[in-house]
């Protein structure tokens, strides 16, 4: 990823999230690592990653992740009861991954307060907003496929 693009994404997310309502950043493996690490450094908010393999640690939460594109398990570690979590994801399409992660965070007795996706395509964001009206869910870029063309939409 180009450093200038990563800096721009970091700056946009820093400006759009209510950091007074966040105790922990959560990224989703693998693109969650380069997206959330600079955010953690910039904001001073600790970071955890939803991983695709188990570490078998005490308190680990297994997530049954099923999307329109893949199926499998993910694992959450280091969530503390009562923590307020901001999830950062690279692409939000169907919302299946984020829905599974939200439910995993809740099983750990923590809460998701913010979700920000770098790219939104499809109806996943709307679906998640309908399912979770208490969570602030947004994207930086919204794309629509128009036949063979990709169309960038304004809010």
Question: Predicted segment positions?
Answer:
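PRPP-associated nucleotide enzymes
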Residues: 1-88, 92-155
